[in-house]
């Protein structure tokens, strides 16, 4: 029978101008994890179930988001996670790094271009026994507005280099399960949004918008 989880977390945040540091240490009592196991009377039959597992993890992140030359807004994020999880004398403790770099250039009040690039190293998550393989992603977009920002066009290209995949593995009780999802192909997308006239509520005086 599953027990309710209990989490104790300590977080420290330091910020100075455009720079921010965040560190977290957490312990989870009776956390919920997904486990593969053998059927009691037949080892050739395996099944998937949830179990309570105690775990701990540490997380450190640094964020830098300045405004340069009045129009360029880069944002850099570096994140490190170290889990501490064990089950049946097997450890699931491999740490992982996450890097993200965003760029937004405001060419005018009505025209912006930007990109997002991120990369994740292989490692275990902080909340389960799943092992994720390395993954990278890149996106490019431009936004143009008309009619005092009422009409908005957003043209984007997602997964530019076709490198983003969902690939992970669960290895418990001698049973290995792999998943490789290759459906996230490069995509060209155009989104058009129109915002209608704002009308004020006669009760609270707040503006409401229909899109």
Describe the function of each predicted region.
Residues 80-85, 99-146, 156-162, 170, ...:
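C-terminal beta-barrel architecture of Gram-negative outer-membrane proteins
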């Amino acid at each position: 029978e599953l027990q309710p989880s209990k989490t104790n977390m300590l977080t420290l945040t330091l910020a100075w101008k455009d720079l921010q540091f965040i560190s977290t240490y957490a312990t989870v009592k009776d956390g919920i994890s997904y486990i593969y196991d053998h059927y009691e009377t037949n080892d050739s039959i395996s099944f998937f179930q949830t179990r309570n597992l105690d775990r701990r993890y540490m997380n450190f992140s640094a964020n830098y988001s300045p405004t340069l030359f009045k129009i360029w807004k880069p944002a850099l994020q570096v994140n490190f996670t170290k889990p501490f999880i064990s089950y049946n004398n097997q450890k699931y403790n491999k740490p992982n790094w996450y890097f993200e770099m965003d760029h937004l250039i405001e060419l005018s009040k009505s025209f912006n271009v930007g990109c997002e690039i991120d990369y994740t190293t292989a490692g275990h998550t902080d909340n389960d026994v799943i092992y994720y393989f390395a993954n990278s992603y890149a996106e490019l977009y431009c936004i143009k507005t008309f009619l005092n920002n009422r009409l908005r066009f957003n043209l984007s290209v997602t997964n530019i280099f076709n490198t983003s995949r969902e690939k992970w593995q669960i290895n418990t009780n001698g049973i290995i399960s792999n998943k490789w999802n290759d459906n996230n192909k490069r995509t060209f997308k155009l989104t058009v949004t129109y915002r209608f006239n704002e009308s004020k509520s006669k009760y609270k005086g707040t503006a409401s918008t229909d899109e």
